[in-house]
Amino acid sequence: MGISLADSIYSTEKPLSQMRIAITAIDLEQAEHRGIAYVSKGLISSLSDLGAEVYLLTRFDGHRLNPLMKRSMSKQSVREVDCADILDQFCDPSNRIKKIKKKKLHDFDEDLINKLTNKLILFKNKSQIIIDLLFSVFRFYMKRGIFTGRLIHLSNFENTPYFGQERVDYLSKISGFVSIRNIYNLSNLRSKRFLFKSPTIDLRQLNLDLLITTCPLSIEVRTNSRSSGICLQLIHDDIPLSFSKHPDHPFAFYNRLKDAMKTKNCFISKASQEKICYLLEKSCSNVEKNIIYPLPSLNLNKLELASKVKSLRGINKKYILFNSSVLPRKNLSFLINIFQSSQISDKGFDLCVAGKIHDDKYGLDIKRMCESDSRIKLLDYVDETEKAWLFLNAHAFASPSCVEGFGIPVLDAASLGVPVLASDLPSHREIANLVKENRNFRLLDLSNVDKWINEFNQLSTLDLCMEDE
């Protein structure tokens, strides 16, 4: 059995009180927080609870002050401004969204002037990307691929204007930021083999002991340790290699995995470890020691708050819950077909879909499948309190994913004792073994449609069965 991050919750000791640890924030910088972001939040919380000083390695930096302004201000004032800029970028991804919208303006019928204006905007955006890329490469070679970054302390986060924002609730657990501009772009360039070596982060001047990457990266470190450098890479899955529609290019992702395997590494499931070792033709040594199971994503405070909420978004029937960003590999179309083919809706049940629906072909197909079916509730994005309420009140949870590195929503449901219907994947089997006390955990073969329909029909009798027990 692997190690669970939940072990830290019950620890009264502080064995990491002398350690200063940097954690990559690449997933927390994204506009949409997905599974890896929740793993990162759990890791931050666990390390902090065990006494470590935690710093986020970020590509964000201060942008309101130019060098001349900084020279005329005190160091503390500059750090205060830069820290506020970094916090704002973590809190508000709207700038990124606005740029995307600008790029889409040319899709609409417009007059000639507007079309020309949009073409100029697109040209400017693309030119800026190219200029930034060239500048990053130039800077990389000027520094010989070695970066120190700036250590920016975050003190009294509770007294900042950003405290209380759900998106950054993890910031109360960190001590500050390590800001290295374009560090993840450089790592990406190395994974595509456009750079002759991986960017190296020198942790010695920052007095940091360890770097943990929350996903495989082409990156190296230098520390005060006698070893060549302490970097622990957390590896989730092989999905970009096994699923063609994944946005990551398989060559770049393969190289990221290859580079990560050269350092110390851990996996979030035994299934992921075995598959990745097989693909990279590596032997799986220390199988049990190299697995760290994630925490459930449901926050205890949010669960307590949600338990006091009587109703949500007009939901007034029993429902089956699906919780995930709507992506092809999550197989929501399969679940909708099962729901519509079963008799459970005739017995007063709805299907609630909680997760962002993207403006792509798959998202549009899902909307078309549901547009004439009032029994299917497409809730789109839900906040953490809403998500907690949906799990607390769900009659059952369903996850028909085609491929998963782990499956945190399945863990969330099973941990609360919610009946689970999940695709029979190796990672889902591991979750079933972790929550053996949940006797209503069903693993179903995706090729057996009749079995899925039958299990859906049986859900309506679940309450009666539980009462008999």
Where are the predicted features?
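Carbohydrate transferase catalytic cores enriched for Leloir-type hexosyltransferases
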Residues: G2-E469
